[in-house]
Amino acid sequence: MANTAQARKRARQNTKRRQNSASQRSMVRTYLKRVDAAIAAKDYDAATEAYKKAVPVLDRMADKGILHKNKAARRKSRLNKTIKGLQA
């Protein structure tokens, strides 16, 4: 338990930040699930549209530090590669 005023404040801030981060991570997962669902259905147009909506979200979370920038880049690259495979 936090004993000083400073420690109590930090505990409050950490709780708020943890909740915000969890919400944002959940949002990223939702966007990625939409892309994955379109890929599973082998629907190129839907997958492309979902991917276009997911990319800015991934970039924003990487900028905020919710996701590591390399992880965001890797996810985008793999999704794009999979979508390009649907086109052929």
Swiss-Prot record:
Belongs to the bacterial ribosomal protein bS20 family. The lineage of its organism: Bacteria, Pseudomonadati, Pseudomonadota, Gammaproteobacteria, Moraxellales. Keywords: Ribonucleoprotein, Ribosomal protein, RNA-binding, rRNA-binding. Residues 7-19 have a biased composition (Basic residues). GO terms for biological process: translation. This is Small ribosomal subunit protein bS20. It comes from Psychrobacter arcticus (strain DSM 17307 / VKM B-2377 / 273-4). The keyword Ribonucleoprotein applies. GO terms for cellular component: cytosol; small ribosomal subunit. It holds the Pfam family Ribosomal_S20p.
